[in-house]
Amino acid sequence: VDLSKKFGCTPEQALPLLQLAQAKGIKVMGLSFHVGSQVPHARRHVQAINACREIMEQAWDLGRKPWVLDIGGGFPVDYEGGEFDIDGFCAPIREALAKLPATVQKIAEPGRFISAPAMTSVSSVMGKAHRGDKIWYYLDDGLYGSYNGQLYDHVTYPVSTPYAHGELHNAVLSGPTCDSVDVIRDGIMLPDLAIGELVVGRVMGAYTWASASTFNFF
């Protein structure tokens, strides 16, 4: 997810901005960057840290004292249920940060990594239809609700029906709105679900209800 289009500056613009801030009496505490969301490897973090280190060194040579570096977030979450090696991911980041003077305060903001596993969402089947060779189940939550990350973040949340058993059928889990894009999962094999049956979504603590709407009054 690109977060750099609307805000920020290029590394080449940073030092002139620091000089402009000093000329206007603005005290700059440090530098910050954000490499995006769900970054698969730490290469971008390392590149950004190295760029900030060069900017800070130039600023120090000119007598300016930026002493805080905020490396933002971007630490990924494994939505497939595997064990993500966060120590391995952070190793090159720690190595790059170690090249900064000890006086530089380092800040990280791993929001998704911390919050995503903290929430499990439970929805219920409010409608059912046989359409072609699939059974459609209409839930009371969907892509305009807590599953909106499938649109915004390209995330596929793990879903299950822990209380339903029996022969599996080709099915669709749909949200409740009129929009045809409001489909949580198409082609999922599920046992026969009754109205009121519960569907569980996991790893849903990040950017779910915070980005939800009330479209179609749901």
What are these regions (language model features)?
Residues 6, 27-32, 66-70, 105-107, ...:
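Structural preference for beta-strand elements that scaffold enzyme active sites
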Residues 99:
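Active-site phosphate-binding and catalytic loops of NTP-dependent enzymes
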Residues 7, 33, 75, 84, ...:
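Phenylalanine-focused residue identity feature
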Residues 35-36, 69-79, 110-113:
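Glycine-rich beta-strand-to-loop/alpha-helix junction loops that act as flexible
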Residues 38, 43, 49, 76, ...:
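Alpha-helix termini
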Residues 1-68, 92, 96:
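Active-site-proximal beta-alpha core segment in soluble small-molecule metabolic enzymes
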Residues 4-14, 38-50, 79-88, 112-118, ...:
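Active-site glycine- and acidic-residue-rich loops that bind
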Residues 92-94, 103-218:
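Charged (often Lys/Glu-rich) extended helix/loop segments that serve as interaction or gating elements
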